[in-house]
Structure formats: C-alpha cells, structure tokens
Amino acid sequence: MKSNNPFTRHGIEHLSPSKINLWVTDPALFIGTYLCGMKGSYGVGAFRGTAVEFALNKKIVDTDLSKEATNEFLYGSFNEQCIEKGLSTENIKAQKERNTLETYYDQAFNVYKDFGVPEFYQHKIYYTLHEDLPTPFLGFIDFVFNDAIRDLKTTARMPSSISTNHQRQLAVYSKAFPDKELWVDYVTPKQAVSYKVENVEQILNQVIKISLGLQKFLSISDDPYELASMHYP
C-alpha cells in the first residue's frame, strides 16, 4: 500500500537539523543527496571535531586522566575515523588536521573543565516535532549538563556570531530538554567563544515551517528526477 507520507515515499525515514539546513542552503544538493542517491563528500574537519569531543568527554568524566591517555583517545578517534572512510592517515589533509588536534582540544577543555560531569554525551533524540509532520527528527546532542545543552564546534576561523544553521540545530534539541539553556561553543586553535541561543520558540517555529515546506515539495511527485528538474544546481 502506498504511503501517504511524502518523506517515506522518497526514502526519508527521519528528518534532522542537517537535512533541514541543507534544504534551505542548497536545495539542489539536498535533492541529489537524499532523493537521487548521490554520494556526498566528507571533510577531515569533521573527524577533528568528533575526536576532540570524544577525548574531551573522557577527560571531564575522569579528571585524573593523564595527558598521555587523553591524547590516545584524541588521536585514536581521529585515526579510526580515517580508516572507516578509507582515508590514509598519511593523506596531506589528514596530516594537517591531525597536527592541530591538541590545540583544538586544549581550547575546548578550557571551556568545559568547570562544567562538571555531563548527564549525557552524544545523547540521541528521536521525536515528532509537529502533528502535521509524521516523520520524526533524529539528532545527537554533544553534551547535556545539569543546566544546559552544549554543542561543540571546531572551526578554523572564529565566526562573529552564532550561525542560523546552528541555532536551528539547538532549537530542535531543546524539545528534549525544554528547561535547559542552549549554548554553542566555537573553538579554534587559538581561542574559544560561546554563544547562547535566544528566541528558541521562534527558531523552532521556523524549523517547522521549513519542514512543512519540504514536505509539500516532496508531495508534488514521487519521481525524484522530476523534482530535481525544478531546481537548477
């Protein structure tokens, strides 16, 4: 029996902040990736962020962890991700990122060292955001503390303000812990800056409107290539 859900008819079993943000910033790439099966590229910068978060969690949970042990988690996580993607750790880009890991980690630790032990790390959320959106949202929260949700972003250049994409991401997470503050922590090798997400309900309503708009677009046709023809890359 044919589904009445436009998302599942196109093979989209769940929504996520990254999918919604991609739909807004680059509809053609969204269509190519999620409707037409085009394989997306990946950057080793993402490996860097995951490795820093992993080692950071190990350290703030066990404050007695030595620098050597922490580095084992840091470099081990990075190398493992490279291997999983079939990327040699001798790759020039991988080496460049690997050489900066400790500087990113040190900046992140200076931010997180006084927050205590997190209640959750990489906490999975999975829920329906709106009654008119049958497809649930899936996401993973970096750190959940007693009073706040915190998302760590490693970046080569410090932004002047919190990005709209990251505000949407944290707003989606807020549904799981509505009483907690939302913070995005940007970390470069030289500094760290934290931004609190304000106007959460307004941003969440924006996410809902974007999602409903995407749902309406997908309902136009079950043929992904017909939908693709409506957007010039």
Where are these regions (language model features)?
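Metal-dependent nuclease catalytic regions and adjoining charged, substrate-binding loops involved
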Residues: 15, 98-101, 121, 133, ...
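Short, surface-exposed beta-strand-loop junctions and turns on beta-sheet-rich folds
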Residues: 38, 156-159, 190-191
